[in-house]
């Protein structure tokens, strides 16, 4: 028996188990211990350890504790019999061992918790008890054979039988018995449970080991030292069991509960059975039956006290038993038993609470492992023990055989019963009384069996157990797909889930084919986990080890089913996991959901890439790098859905989201394949959507509702086929999408409406785009409907609001059910609002935001593979950023949303770009669509004519119809507005729908949509559609409004009110009101504001676009505009959205009265064309500014979220900022570099593009991201020269540079500038000389460029300093501004207060410095951080109070003030400030700098540049004041963006104004990017303007 001391050695293992177990219970106790303690304790100590455990139990630990108990036990026995009260138990507990005593208390406390979780507790306990019983059986045999514990198990059969009835009857009795009732009987009951283990100890301790064991068991139950004796072995098992239990609990808490019950119930029969089992166990301890019986009462008292205090003695008994089971193994580690007793006990209670999970896994193990016969289990058990993962499965099975011998056959069979009471009924066959115990017995026995090699269990049990396990464990927690992302938690959680899902198949199969499981476990390093866990190890391993074995993949694939990998897993599983056909099939079943999402194509593709996809799916699932890898081939337009769906599935859980957050951040970091990235983005989005659980769910509803709409929309769009990737538009496509929606869980369904409604766009995208992206984007768009792609991103946050609103509204809007969609949008927005409020309000929000953002953005990033921008955009848009994506999508929708299809095409074009750099996705969403739309759409829209109609809208918008709708038909917005927009609106809304009109249809959708669609889609679409759009404001806003340029303002307003699309920003009160009005604004605004907005939006943007740079405005502006509006619309929406729900936002809103009561002003200003468009943005921004405190935190959170996927967020900002650039932003970051070269050399290109509107258009499409960023910037500067061109292009250029680098965000954003020195150069390319003040860039770069590049700052600063250039621009821009000012002046004036840029333009013409200064402190102080918003607010403020000076001042000073601090100082200022997020946005977006430091850039090209450029800008600023000053400092970013003063000013206002102004649009893009984008990114950038952006981006 000294081996028992050795057992103590095992104790180390057990101890590990114990701590692990402790840890395990915390989350998934089973997970960690399974690998570590379980493996060591169980596999190594499988037979010996058990023996050791048993011996240690009996001898070392047990004798001492036992002696204590023994000494006490006689009295306790006498007393205990009498004293069922906890006192007896407690004294024993305390007397036995202080540690256990405390544990007893702990246990009791936990038990109380457990009692609360009693059903689960019962399962858990029973499981544990069963395990313990199994161990007892094992130990009885083991005890006889210290070495051949398992082989000795045969003696266990009698005890097994006894235990069986013992468990059975008492199990039922315990289950039925009230805690107190059970307390009295269960004093014994508890004893029996322990006697179960006692038999183990009894054989170990011949003298009174029974009693000692009983006390040990009692102590264990009670937390007494005696427990350690059972605890040691049991704990080993328990560690194993705990891990298994964890898995089991995940899969089937019932089993454990039953097990606990079964184990507990034995109390009534314990003495007789104990005696009987004792003799059996007693082989050595046959004499101890009585001792055991005696033991029983004392132990029972212990248990009773535990149980009684525990509320449910049963639960407690079960718990103690469970603990004992758990601790039994650990008790093999004598010291550990006690330690374990304490921890174990605590864990056990935890298990009661958390062991549900543990117990479930335990159950799983118990159930699962039952399969193998005891004897078989013996060798296998040893193996399994070595291979802990398998151990449970096999061991249990082995245990079954032994149990059969022991007579726990019933138990083995009963395990299923724990799974279902039916098993208990089934148990009766073995014994009428034992049936419940049989049910529970099998659980414990299998559990113990794995430890003790419970071969005694009959194989019959094994089979049943196996089936039961499969049943109970497998399907239970499929949602754990989440866990996939969560590698650690995910391990247990996902494993359990996978096990649950796959466990049935796999479990069954594994039971049959344990070897593969074993392998898989070894591969998965989760060797510790038994097969049910085995699958988990595979998944875990696969997650952890990127390249899990294919074999593992089969089992591990189950996760994949959750993800796209699921489908791949289906194929791969089928291909690879042929052996595990069932598992595979199950996965396929699981894939059924995804598969619909997938087209058959996806499956085919996956089938083709079974191996690749298996791996890739795994990777995809994990990093979605695989998505990037795999999607190329696999990812057909239909595939992205599947990929996204997989993430959607994953996003089913926030865990996934969380994991995605860091996993995507990490694994997907770069968002390399637009595919994988888009994919990830979608998944993340979906996750994010799931993150917004309510949102997703509502979306689901919409999905259902939208489908009809979608069907129409789809049909309407004429991309029905693609939309429902499977040709069936509504039926197939929808179902697919719907399924995916389902998969998305909540998101997809809603997305489906959006997807379908939006799906028309999505499908359109998918179909029209037909490109990998289209599906992705379409699915991000259409799937935006799914909110996974877009809706997930935009509609996630926005999907709830805008996306669904926009997507639904758009899709529905076009589908003809805008109202319903609007409802949904509102609902969604409400959800979104609520969610965001939660995010903002709760620290959770940090995680959520981070996750959402991270997931969203990283996902965006990964979704955007190369460019998370759109995904990020989508993601940001998704939740708060949803606004951005909205913006992005809106820019996209404006550019793309306006041509949702266009956006889709943009996406699609961006798909290339997007795949190249999903920024296109953001762009696609926000900017790429515009850019991509312009450029990609131009490029791709051709590819996707329908979207082209839409996507081409921007591009085609040269066919202003769709394109203007994209930006409200910017100039055409008027005609395009009314005319093109209806078409465009349809297309746009549709496209927008597709694009989501992203901002349009997303949270902003209503807002931006309203602004955009309503602005210009609504006028035309709003006019025709917008009314409905108005009615369905979100639809209008999103669909129709989205089209409107005015809606962009509306969107801004909406954004500011954030709702407008959902009114959910209503909290914004004013803005909500205004935004709600934005809804109205979109609606109201659609009519009035719409007109206003049309004027503002259309005029602002269109005017600016049309007037300022009709041509470039049409295209480049559209892109800029879209991004502007998109960015701003989105961002404000995001910012405002969040702000809206944030009281601070309201507070700030008041503070930002200057912002025109962002909401009020937004809406009002929206209403007033002046305030309307520009102010909507200003409001939005201002609102953001206002809400900056709240928004700052919100945005900060969001930005952090984005920050989490900083690059993505930034990227999407990039995207938004430079739609095309945005596209390049991520994947194209190189492209950006390329374009950066362009940007650098874009002077040339920009000159051409900037000079020529066509060039600009080239830039506009910004294929030339450089073209846009460079071209935009350069063009802007050149356009500064060209006035109109410079006007637009500079912005795009900065946008491009800004957002080009945006992938870097900090870097890319600036890298676009900085990294893209070209940006500084190119951004300043047109004005590299102009931007010569690149030195300022250094300081400027210090802001956002600091990390990325002084150059960018320089470039930006250059732009700011560019004031010379900016002046040039201003000079040019004034002309440029003049067209814009024409409409900008009118528009700007119209929304001059709102449109600081307008005022900026006009006011810019005024002494911006004064304004700047005037507003600067205020702006800075008030909006300091909210510079963007402040700029917007100040834009508003400056517009309102000073107009330009106010604006400029804050901008200028803000720049110096914010900027000088540099990114950090500036970030802190705005960071600290309400504008911090915004400023960070501005800052974080170089555009932020530009915007924030539009004046900043100009004045604070450097902090000194602040003044110097400010001066420079001022002198030039005054002349160029409107453009240069504003652009210079008003929009240094814009200036930097080469946005020319106006763009610069517009940049800041652009957020509001530039973003609204076509002229500023150039800026607007950057400004928007800088402003709204910056605003949004600002927080992201703000946290790490450079770092995060740069880092995240990179």
Curated annotation (Swiss-Prot):
Modified residues (Phosphothreonine): 1394
One annotated Gene Ontology cellular component of this protein: nucleus
DNA-binding region: 395-407, 541-553
Linked residues for Glycyl lysine isopeptide (Lys-Gly) (interchain with G-Cter in SUMO2): 606, 1402
Residue ranges, compositional bias (Low complexity): 272-303, 1153-1168, 1180-1191, 1245-1264
Sites of Omega-N-methylarginine modification: 887
Extent of Polar residues compositional bias: 165-177
Record region (Disordered): 19-111, 149-241, 256-307, 367-464, 578-604, 714-789, 942-967, 1152-1191, 1245-1306, 1495-1525
Keyword Isomerase: no
Comp. bias regions, Basic and acidic residues: 178-193
Signal peptide annotation: none
Compartment(s): Nucleus; Chromosome
InterPro entries membership: AHDC1 (IPR039225), DUF4683 (IPR032757)
Biased amino acid composition, Basic residues: 391-401, 734-743
UniProt keyword Metal-binding, yes or no: no
BP GO terms, sorted: cell differentiation; mesoderm formation; skin morphogenesis
Knocked-out gene: effects: Lethality; mice do not survive past birth. Mutant mice show developmental patterning defects affecting craniofacial structure, abdominal wall closure and epidermal stratification.
Coiled-coil ranges (or none): none
Comp. bias intervals (Pro residues): 30-47, 427-447
Main location class: nucleus
Described function: Transcription factor required for the proper patterning of the epidermis, which plays a key role in early epithelial morphogenesis. Directly binds promoter and enhancer regions and acts by maintaining local enhancer-promoter chromatin architecture. Interacts with many sequence-specific zinc-finger transcription factors and methyl-CpG-binding proteins to regulate the expression of mesoderm genes that wire surface ectoderm stratification.
Protein name: Transcription factor Gibbin
Source organism of the structure: Mus musculus
């Amino acid at each position: 028996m000294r081996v028992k001391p050795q057992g103590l050695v095992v104790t180390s293992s057990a101890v590990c188990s114990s701590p692990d177990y402790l840890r395990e219970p915390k989350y998934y106790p089973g997970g960690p211990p399974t690998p570590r303690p379980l493996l060591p304790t169980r596999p190594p100590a499988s037979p010996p350890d058990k023996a050791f455990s048993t011996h240690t139990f009996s001898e070392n630990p047990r004798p001492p504790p036992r002696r204590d108990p023994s000494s006490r036990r006689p009295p306790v026995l006498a007393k205990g019999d009498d004293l069922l009260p906890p006192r007896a138990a407690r004294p024993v507990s305390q007397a036995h061992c202080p540690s256990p005593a405390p544990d007893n208390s702990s246990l009791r406390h936990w038990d109380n918790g457990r009692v609360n979780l009693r059903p689960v507790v019962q399962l858990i306990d029973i499981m544990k008890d069963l395990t313990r019983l199994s161990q007892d059986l094992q130990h009885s045999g083991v005890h006889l054979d210290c070495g051949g514990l398992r082989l000795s198990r045969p003696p266990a059969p009698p005890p097994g039988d006894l235990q069986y009835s013992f468990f059975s009857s008492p199990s039922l009795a315990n289950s039925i018995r009230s805690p107190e009732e059970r307390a009295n009987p269960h004093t014994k009951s508890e004893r029996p449970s322990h006697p179960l283990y006692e038999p183990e100890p009894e054989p170990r301790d011949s003298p009174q080991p029974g009693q000692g064991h009983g006390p040990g068991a009692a102590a264990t139950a009670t937390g007494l030292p005696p427990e350690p004796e059972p605890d040691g072995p049991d704990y080993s098992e328990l560690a194993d069991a705990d891990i298994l239990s964890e898995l089991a609990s995940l899969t089937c808490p019932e089993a454990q509960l039953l097990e606990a019950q079964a184990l507990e119930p034995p109390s009534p029969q314990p003495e007789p059975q104990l005696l009987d089992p004792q003799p059996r166990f007693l082989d050595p301890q046959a004499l101890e039956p009585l001792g055991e019986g005696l033991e029983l009462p004392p132990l029972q008292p212990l248990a009773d006290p535990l149980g009684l205090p525990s509320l449910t003695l049963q639960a407690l008994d079960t718990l103690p038993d469970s603990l004992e089971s758990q601790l039994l193994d650990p008790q093999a580690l004598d010291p550990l038993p006690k330690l374990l007793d304490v921890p174990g006990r605590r864990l056990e209670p935890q298990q009661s609470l958390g062991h549900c999970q543990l117990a479930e896994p335990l159950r799983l193990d118990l159930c699962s492992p039952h399969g193998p016969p005891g004897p078989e289990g013996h060798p296998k058990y040893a193996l399994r023990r070595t291979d802990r993962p398998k151990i449970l499965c096999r061991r249990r099975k082995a245990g079954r055989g032994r149990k059969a011998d022991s007579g726990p056959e019933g138990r083995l069979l009963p395990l299923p019963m724990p799974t279902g009471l039916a098993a208990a009924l089934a148990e009766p066959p073995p014994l009428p009384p034992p049936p419940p115990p049989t049910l529970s017995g099998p659980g414990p026995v299998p559990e113990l069996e794995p430890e003790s090699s419970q071969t005694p269990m009959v194989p019959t049990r094994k089979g049943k157990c196996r089936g039961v396990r499969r049943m109970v464990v497998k399907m239970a927690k499929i949602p754990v797909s989440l866990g996939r992302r969560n590698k650690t938690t995910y391990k247990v959680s996902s494993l359990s889930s996978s096990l649950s899902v796959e466990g049935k198949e796999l479990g069954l199969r594994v039971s049959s084919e344990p070897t593969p499981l074993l392998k898989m476990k070894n591969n998965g390093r989760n060797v510790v986990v038994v097969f049910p866990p085995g699958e988990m190890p595979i998944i875990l391993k696969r997650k952890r080890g990127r390249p899990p074995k294919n074999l593992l993949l089969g089992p591990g694939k189950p996760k994949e089913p959750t993800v796209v990998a699921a489908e791949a897993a289906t194929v791969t599983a089928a291909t690879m996991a042929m052996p595990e056909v069932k598992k595979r099939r199950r996965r396929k079943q699981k894939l059924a959901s995804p598969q619909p999402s997938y087209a058959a194509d996806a499956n085919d593709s996956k089938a083709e890439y079974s191996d690749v996809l298996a791996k890739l799916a795994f990777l995809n699932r994990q990093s979605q790098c695989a998505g990037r890898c795999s999607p190329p081939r696999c990812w057909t337009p239909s595939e992205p859905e599947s990929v996204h769906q997989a993430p959607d599935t994953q996003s089913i859980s926030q865990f996934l989201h969380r994991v995605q957050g860091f996993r995507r951040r990490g694994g997907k970091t770069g968002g390399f394949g637009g595919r994988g990235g888009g994919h990830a983005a979608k998944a993340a989005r979906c996750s994010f959507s799931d993150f917004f659980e309510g949102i997703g769910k509502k979306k689901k509803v919409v999905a259902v509702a939208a489908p009809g709409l979608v069907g129409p929309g789809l049909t309407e769009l004429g991309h029905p086929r693609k939309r429902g990737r499977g040709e069936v538009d509504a039926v197939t496509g929808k179902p697919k999408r719907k399924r995916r929606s389902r998969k998305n869980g909540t998101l997809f369904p809603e997305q489906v409406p959006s997807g379908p409604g939006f799906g028309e766009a999505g499908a359109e995208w998918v179909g029209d785009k037909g490109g990998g992206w289209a599906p992705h984007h379409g699915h991000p768009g259409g799937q935006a409907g799914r909110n996974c792609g877009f809706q997930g991103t935009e509609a996630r946050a926005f999907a709830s609001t805008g996306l669904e609103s926009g997507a639904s509204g758009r899709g529905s809007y076009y589908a003809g059910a805008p109202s319903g969609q609007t409802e949904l949008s509102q609902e969604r927005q409400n959800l979104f609002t609520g969610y965001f409020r939660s995010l903002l309000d709760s620290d959770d929000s940090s995680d959520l935001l981070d996750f959402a953002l991270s997931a969203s953005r990283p996902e965006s990033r990964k979704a955007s593979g190369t460019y998370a921008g759109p995904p990020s955009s989508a993601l940001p848009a998704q939740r708060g950023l949803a606004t951005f994506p909205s913006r992005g999508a809106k820019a996209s929708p404006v550019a793309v949303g306006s041509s949702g299809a266009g956006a889709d095409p943009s996406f699609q074009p961006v798909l290339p770009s997007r795949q190249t750099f999903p920024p296109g996705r953001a762009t696609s969403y926000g900017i790429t669509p515009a850019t991509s739309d312009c450029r990609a759409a131009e490029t791709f829209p051709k590819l996707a004519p329908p979207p082209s109609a839409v996507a081409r809208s921007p591009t085609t918008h040269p066919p202003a119809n769709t394109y203007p709708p994209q930006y409200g038909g910017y100039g055409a917005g008027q005609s395009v507005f009314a005319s093109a927009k209806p078409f465009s609106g349809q297309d746009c809304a549709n496209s927008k729908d597709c694009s989501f009109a992203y901002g349009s249809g997303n949270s902003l959708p209503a807002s931006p949509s309203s602004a955009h669609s309503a602005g210009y889609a609504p006028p035309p679409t709003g006019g025709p559609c917008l009314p409905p759009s108005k009615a369905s404001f979100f639809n209008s806003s999103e669909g129709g409004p989205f089209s409107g340029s005015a809606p962009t303002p509306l969107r801004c307003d909406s954004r500011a009110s954030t709702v407008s699309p959902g009114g959910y920003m209503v909290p914004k009160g004013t803005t909500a009101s205004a935004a709600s009005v934005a809804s109205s604004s979109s609606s109201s605004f659609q009519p009035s504001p719409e007109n206003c907005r049309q004027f503002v939006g259309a005029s602002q943007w269109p005017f600016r676009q049309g007037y300022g740079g009709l041509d470039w405005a049409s295209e480049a502006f559209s892109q800029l505009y879209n991004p502007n509006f998109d960015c701003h619309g989105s961002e404000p929406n995001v910012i405002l959205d969040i702000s809206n729900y944030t009281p601070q936002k309201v507070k700030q809103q008041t503070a930002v009265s200057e912002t025109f009561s962002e909401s009020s002003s937004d809406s009002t200003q929206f209403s007033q064309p002046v305030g309307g468009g520009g102010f909507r943005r200003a409001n939005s921004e201002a609102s953001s500014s206002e809400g900056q405190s709240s928004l700052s935190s919100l945005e900060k959170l969001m930005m952090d979220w984005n920050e989490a996927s900083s690059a993505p967020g930034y990227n999407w900002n990039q995207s938004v900022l430079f739609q095309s650039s945005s596209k390049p932003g991520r994947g194209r970051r190189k492209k950006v570099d390329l374009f950066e070269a362009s940007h650098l050399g874009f002077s040339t290109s920009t000159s051409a593009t900037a000079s020529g509107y066509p060039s600009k258009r080239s830039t506009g499409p910004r294929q030339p991201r450089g073209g846009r960023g460079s071209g935009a910037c350069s063009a802007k500067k050149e356009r500064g020269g060209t006035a109109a061109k410079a006007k637009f292009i500079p912005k795009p250029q900065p946008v491009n540079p800004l957002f080009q680098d945006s992938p870097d965000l900090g870097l890319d954003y600036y890298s676009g500038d900085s990294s893209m020195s070209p940006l500084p150069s190119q951004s300043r390319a047109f004005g590299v000389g102009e931007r010569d003040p690149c030195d300022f860039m250094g300081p400027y770069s210090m802001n956002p460029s600091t990390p990325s590049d002084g150059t960018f700052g320089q470039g930006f600063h250059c732009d700011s300093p560019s004031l010379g250039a900016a002046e040039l621009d201003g000079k040019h821009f004034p002309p440029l501004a003049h067209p814009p000012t024409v409409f900008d002046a009118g528009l700007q004036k119209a929304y001059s207060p709102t449109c600081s840029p307008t005022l900026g333009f006009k006011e810019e013409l005024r002494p911006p410095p004064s304004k700047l200064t005037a507003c600067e402190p205020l702006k800075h102080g008030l909006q300091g951080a909210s510079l963007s918003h402040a700029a917007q607010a100040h834009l508003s403020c400056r517009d309102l109070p000073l107009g330009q000076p106010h604006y400029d001042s804050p901008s200028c000073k803000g720049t110096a003030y914010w900027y000088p601090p540099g990114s950090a100082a500036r970030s802190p200022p705005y960071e600290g400030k309400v504008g911090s997020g915004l400023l960070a946005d501005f800052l974080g977006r170089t555009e932020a700098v530009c915007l924030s430091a539009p004046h900043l850039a100009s004045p604070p090209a450097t902090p000194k540049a602040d003044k110097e450029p400010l001066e420079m800008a001022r002198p030039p600023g005054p002349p160029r004041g409107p453009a240069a000053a504003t652009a210079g400092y008003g929009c240094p970013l814009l200036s930097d963006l080469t946005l020319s003063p106006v763009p610069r000013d517009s940049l800041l206002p652009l957020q509001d104004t530039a973003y609204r102004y076509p002229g500023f649009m150039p800026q607007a893009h950057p400004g928007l990017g800088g402003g709204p984008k910056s605003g949004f990114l600002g927080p992201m950038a703000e946290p790490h303007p450079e770092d995060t952006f740069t880092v995240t981006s990179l």
